[in-house]
Amino acid sequence: MSINIDIKKITDLLNSSILFPDDVQELLREKYIVLERKSNGTPTVAHIYKTMARFDNKSIYRIAKFLFMNRPDVIKLLFLKDVEPLLPDKSINISINNTEYPQLEGPIGTKIALLELFNAFRTGRSEPIPYYYLPLRKDINNIVTK
């Protein structure tokens, strides 16, 4: 009895950062998640933090700096140049991000950047947390069913 295993196919599958059921369960157990998205809004990476993003200790700005560190136009628009990025405790790849982001500038660019930032904060739990953390379940269901 021989089993035909295509090593290249398996390697490509693993390298494409497929989201496995264990990853979904882990995300649904996490309390503080920040989603990085493609320019079309599809989540690409879930960054997990053990502590809540807060305004009083400026951790929310540090998380924003990390989230947009590869997008200097957004860093400039949101006045985050002098802020040190806060690295996540863990990151889970959800999908491949091979798209270019449009250059954001002016008042409309600022609004788009803020909208993207405010939609990044998610939670997998249902316990009370600040208003800016939205439920993650909808995003995960959209990815798993695609």
From Swiss-Prot:
Chain segments annotated as transmembrane: none
Disulfide bridge map: none
Expression triggers: Expressed in the late phase of the viral replicative cycle.
Keywords noted in UniProt: Late protein, Virion
The organism's place on the tree of life at top rank: Viruses
One Pfam short name: Pox_D2
Coiled-coil residue spans: none
Compartment(s) of residence: Virion
Keyword Aminoacyl-tRNA synthetase: no
Any Gene Ontology CC annotation: virion component
InterPro entries recorded: Pox_D2
Functional description taken from the UniProt entry: Late protein which is part of a large complex required for early virion morphogenesis. This complex participates in the formation of virosomes and the incorporation of virosomal contents into nascent immature virions.
Subunit record text: Part of a complex composed of the kinase OPG054, OPG092, OPG100, OPG114, OPG115, OPG142 and OPG157.
Family the entry assigns: Belongs to the orthopoxvirus OPG114 family.
Record protein name field: Core protein OPG114
